[in-house]
Amino acid sequence: MKNTETFSKFLLNRLGRSAFAIVGLMVFALGSYFQIQANFGMSPWNSLSQGISMNYPITFGTANIIISFIIIGIDILMREPIGIGTILNAIIIGAGTDVFLSMGVLPQQTTFIGKFVVLMAGIVITCLGQYLYMKACLSCGPRDSLLVGLGKKFPKVKIGYVNMVLLAMVQVVCFILGSPVGLGTVICVFGTGTITNIVFGFLKFEPRALKHEGIPETLAAAKEALKNGF
């Protein structure tokens, strides 16, 4: 069936979906901030950013952005779609985490209970952020595209368990870089996969089933919409 969407409707649709994705990504950044402030060892991805920022004169957020664009290259090789959501993810999570860190609202935890609770809250929040921004179907972020791409190669394995293996591999690199590794880091490797399965299961969400729009599809839709007028 021919697309009759006008260009103004196309813009409103993509802007609305982009705004929805941005909200989800800021929720994700908040979860990353919680994990840092848990002071219990970070998630492997955060630990990787921290390790790079420790070895080079760049901020945590900048390191996060650099890593994101490197992974985008890997995603392209895996033929995962790269779209508006991918670019937003690469920029907003790192920048958003820096914003929350600069605000300093949540103090670093010093007790075992405090560390554990804040870490678990951070993991749950990041899962919710993943769900929200991925539902916009504007393509996954670099890390999530990598996760989904690997998950498609093992369709019978729950995505959380695929994530667990991926995080374990990232943690090996973190160890080499001298990133801080604590009990919380180990909990993140195994806990993130488990919590992902629980949260996504509760929301009845399967990221591998989503049909994402890549940049070529977005441009094609824009071109078609222009033909239909404003």
Pin down the residues of each PLM region.
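Core subunits and conserved enzymes of cellular information-processing
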Residues: 2-230
